[in-house]
Amino acid sequence: MNIRRAVPEDAEAISALIMGLAQHFLLEPSGKGAERFFTGVTPQAIRTYISHPRFHYLVADQGAALLAAAALRDGCHLFHLFVAPSHQRRGIARSLWSAIRAAAAPDAMSLTVNASPNAVAVYQRFGFVVVGPRQEVDGIAFIPMQAPASAQAF
């Protein structure tokens, strides 16, 4: 497995990965109400994130296969962390998290994530704690979490 900076050519595969996992955090299986989310994970939107200086976007791949993707926004918010179902529970999320954490802004006091309810335990293992109640916004359910930027989680 190789972790590297995402390039615009990765956008199609990243978008497909995220869309394939969407049923795990959508409020409605049909996607009703999540139009804003869907707009934000199109290949064009992903290309914009990859190219924008506010984002640090990484992928994990093996040969030509994209296994996972992660993005840090503004040096302190874990914006995306998705692993293909066939490669979950193999340490890929942890490896991406380590690489993303290393890219955090030097002055960041904490890192945040809006965790999918089924991913809370994973983020807790990474050192995050729940900082607010479950929220439902734009057709998506999430739980706000925070981790100290300087602490070694794991």
What are these regions, as identified by a protein language model?
Residues L81-Q88:
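A short, internal acetyl-CoA/4′-phosphopantetheine-binding micro-motif in the GNAT/acyltransferase core
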Residues P43-L58, H77:
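A short helix-loop-beta-strand connector motif used in the catalytic cores of GNAT acetyltransferases and
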Residues R89-A102:
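Conserved acetyl-CoA-binding loop-helix of GNAT-fold acetyltransferases
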Residues R94, P117-P133, V137-F142:
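Conserved active-site alpha-helix within GNAT-family acetyltransferase domains
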Residues R54-A68, R73:
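Conserved beta-hairpin
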Residues N2-A16:
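A short beta-loop-alpha structural element at the N-terminal edge
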Residues A104-N118:
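Conserved GNAT acetyl-CoA-binding A-motif
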Residues M19-A45:
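Conserved GNAT-fold acetyl-CoA-binding loop/helix
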